[in-house]
Amino acid sequence: FSATNDAFDSNCNLVINGGKVFASGYGMPEGGLDCADESGYRLFINGGEVVAIGGRHSTPEKQSRQPSVQWRLDKLEDGKTYGIDGVSSYKSVRAYQMGGATLLFSSPKLKEGKSYTLSIDGEKKEQIESLKSPTENVGNMRMGFPF
């Protein structure tokens, strides 16, 4: 958890092979998971339960062994529960506004190519397909603030 920076900032290749990872970073340009991809480093998610929230994240590589889903939200409200079809959920511990927030879930329960629905406090919002590298398919939730 970081109140002012990236939550998990490796500055080198970042490989997650298992366990439970919860990374809550600051808003733009900071994020939950940062491997310094702008410098050529890469993020691989091969296993485990991963929830990352922040302004932006490094995007998992296509060579990752486990799929992820990722949404770009105009805002994220404090105290709300964000979940995907009973696979994983996250209860927000702070609000993200104006710069928006990116929410990433990865779990061995996700199946590549299957569509999942983001819900907020149990209300279904938007469906998106899971991919090993979700850059190509990021859901956009317009919730009050323009990008």
Briefly describe each language-model feature range.
Residues 1-147:
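A composition-driven surface/loop motif
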